[in-house]
């Protein structure tokens, strides 16, 4: 199992493994959410030597970003709504633990609960009323 807490700072090998593994898990997340091909993109930004950079799954309605930016809190996955793939600020930020990348069904449930995106997503009161 991948050690999400091992720092990528000044460790090119760890950073490469972090990006490769995170990208693979985000692909699995897209499949678990039953996202339509072409409705999302996966991006990787390795950034500078002192940081992990980030791997992003950007869907038309959801933005999920993985990085070591919340290590002191244990959080490293940002989930928020967005309005298209040109929206980089989106809705309110929600953070979950990096270790959720080891439990894709649980991560998918969190994404559905926060964004309403994906297979079997809960419908908002507004959608139910329509």
Question: Where is each model-derived feature located?
Answer:
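Short intrinsically disordered terminal tails
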Residues: 1-3, 117-130
